[in-house]
């Protein structure tokens, strides 16, 4: 997929909560920069913006799974 950093749900589930927060922060910063480039007409690949937004959604999904107890870090590592 164009623009994806390879953040598959499996990879995300193997990360610690702190690492997920760092990835989320980085992705949000990237979306901000991409939106600015899009507004000024400098964005070459519109698909990158979509891919980063999907990465953010994946990160939020994994974080929410942990919050409500669907999966825990230990469970994910053992699978």
Curated annotation (Swiss-Prot):
Keyword match Phosphoprotein: no
GO MF, any single term: structural constituent of ribosome
Annotated Gene3D superfamilies: 1.10.287.310
InterPro entries with a match to the protein in the record: Ribosomal_protein_uL29 (IPR050063), Ribosomal_uL29 (IPR001854), Ribosomal_uL29_sf (IPR036049)
Protein name: Large ribosomal subunit protein uL29
GO biological process: translation
Entry GO terms, CC: cytosolic large ribosomal subunit
Originating species: Tropheryma whipplei (strain Twist)
One Pfam family this sequence matches: Ribosomal_L29
Keyword terms: Ribonucleoprotein, Ribosomal protein
Keyword flag Protein transport: no
Domain of life: Bacteria
Gene: rpmC
Family the UniProt entry places it in: Belongs to the universal ribosomal protein uL29 family.
SUPFAM superfamilies in the cross-refs: Ribosomal protein L29 (L29p) (SSF46561)
């Amino acid at each position: 997929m164009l623009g994806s950093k390879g953040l598959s749900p499996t990879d995300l589930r193997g990360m610690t909560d702190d690492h997920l927060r760092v990835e989320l922060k980085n992705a949000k910063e990237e979306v901000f920069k991409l939106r600015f480039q899009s507004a000024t007409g400098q964005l070459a690949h519109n698909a990158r913006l979509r891919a980063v937004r999907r990465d953010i959604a994946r990160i939020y999904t994994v974080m929410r799974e942990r919050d409500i107890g669907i999966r825990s870090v230990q469970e994910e590592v053992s699978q």
